[in-house]
């Protein structure tokens, strides 16, 4: 067995992800984490729920004339993340993305709260220093800190900006945030507000 095929799958696979790790060009993995959620916890159940609900979809898109089964995708299951430490969870997410990238494959992450993005971006920017981020959300997530924490779902794009720099975060459908977030976005990101 290839090392990554030894992952224990504690949930069903996403529909159409039938490839082996060795043959895959895309590796899907889950980051069930929601320790900094401030409104309603439960995002940690997201990866399993997304996989479960994927079986209500079809693999073929007539709009794209493409089928998920046209791609070699391996679902490696969910990471076991430490809920007591955001930095530890981010390090695990980053390490998994780094392993996938080093194997010449594309990592595809299912979250979890928004903070999980930072771990994957940390890995991706090492391989792709000119990385751009496309962010669809109702909230800007550009606070410098939230409730005294710099590692929070409300700060994740601010931390990503520290890695990728100005003009490389493209935000769409943003409808709320505090004044400082919108002022920061005007200077540092490409924000397209919700209309």
Regions found by a protein language model. Name each.
Residues 1-7:
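Short, small-residue-biased leader/transition segments that mark boundaries at the very start
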Residues 9-195:
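Conserved alpha-helical scaffold segments that buttress catalytic/binding sites
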């Amino acid at each position: 067995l290839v090392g990554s095929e030894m992952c224990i799958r504690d949930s069903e696979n996403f529909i159409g992800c039938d490839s082996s790790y060795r043959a895959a060009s895309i590796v899907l993995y889950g980051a069930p984490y929601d320790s900094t959620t401030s409104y309603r916890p439960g995002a940690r159940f997201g990866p399993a729920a997304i996989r479960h609900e994927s079986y209500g979809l079809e693999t073929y898109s007539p709009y794209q004339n493409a089928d998920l089964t046209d791609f070699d995708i391996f679902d490696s299951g969910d990471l076991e993340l430490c809920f007591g430490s955001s930095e530890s969870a981010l390090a695990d997410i980053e390490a998994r993305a780094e392993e996938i990238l080093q194997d010449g494959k594309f990592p595809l992450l299912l979250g979890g709260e928004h903070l999980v993005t930072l771990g994957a971006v940390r890995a991706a920017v090492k391989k792709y220093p000119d990385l751009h981020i496309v962010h669809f959300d109702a909230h800007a997530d550009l606070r410098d800190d939230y409730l005294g924490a710099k590692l929070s779902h409300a700060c994740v794009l601010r931390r990503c900006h520290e890695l990728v720099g100005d003009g490389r975060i493209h935000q769409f459908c943003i409808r709320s945030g505090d004044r400082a977030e919108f002022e920061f976005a005007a200077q540092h990101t490409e924000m397209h507000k919700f209309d």
